[in-house]
Amino acid sequence: MTPPGRLYLPRVRGTRLLFLLLGLLLALPPRAKGLPGVGLLPSAARAAQQHPQKHFAHGTLKPAAHLVGDPSMQNSLRWRANTDRAFLRHGFSLSNNSLLVPTSGLYFVYSQVVFSGEGCSSKAVSTPLYLAHEVQLFSSQYPFHVPLLSAQKSVCPGPQGPWVRSVYQGAVFLLTRGDQLSTHTDGISHLLFSPSSVFFGAFAL
C-alpha cells in the first residue's frame, strides 16, 4: 500500500525503461525536442527545410569585395572587378581605384602583390632595389591617407639570376561607412600580374 501523500511509481527496468523514455520523447512537440523547426510555425518550418538558403539569406548577406590587378596597365596598378575571379557584393563599389565601404563595422582587409626581376646588376657596387606595397585609408575623420597595412622588401645586391618576392598582408579594422580603401605600390614595373598574384579585397565580419 502506498503511504498517504506519496505517488506510486512502478518499477521499470532495462529495455522497458528505454522504450518508455523513447515514447515520451516522440510524444513531445518539435519545439520541446530541439529539432528543426524550433520556434517556427509548421508552415514556416517546412519552408525553412525546403529552401534553407532563401530563408536564412537575409542574415548572411555581408559586404565583400575582391579585386585583381589590370595587366593592361603596366605603369600603374589599377584594380578591376569585372572578371570572373573578382567581384563586388552587397554594397561595395569601386571608384577612382578605391573601395568604398558601404556600412560601418569590422572588416578583414587584405592584399597581395608579387614582384619579379631578371636579375641584379653585375656591377661590383649595385644600387639596392626597394619594393613596397601599402593599403591606405581615406576617411572623413582624416584629411590625408592613413596607412593600414604596409610592407617593404629589398633585392640587389644579391645572387645573379631571376628573383621573385611576394608580399601578403591582412588584418581586421573598424571601418566607417563612406571610408575609402586604396593601395600604393613602389616597384610597379616589377609586378607579376595574374589574378592569383596581385589582388586586393575586404569583407565584413
Curated annotation (Swiss-Prot):
Pfam families: TNF
Residues listed as glycosylation sites in the UniProt record: N96
GO molecular function: cytokine activity; tumor necrosis factor receptor binding
Chief location of this protein within or outside the cell: secreted
THD domain: residues covered: 63-205
Signal peptide residues on this chain, from the entry's feature table: 1-34
GO BP terms in the entry: immune response; positive regulation of canonical NF-kappaB signal transduction; positive regulation of extrinsic apoptotic signaling pathway
Subcellular location: Secreted; Membrane
InterPro entries referenced in this protein's UniProt entry, alphabetically: TNF, TNF_beta, TNF_CS, TNF_dom, Tumour_necrosis_fac-like_dom
Segments forming a coiled coil: none
Family from the record: Belongs to the tumor necrosis factor family.
Quaternary structure annotation from Swiss-Prot or TrEMBL: Homotrimer, and heterotrimer of either two LTB and one LTA subunits or (less prevalent) two LTA and one LTB subunits. Interacts with TNFRSF14.
Protein name as annotated: Lymphotoxin-alpha
Taxonomic placement: Eukaryota, Metazoa, Chordata, Craniata, Vertebrata
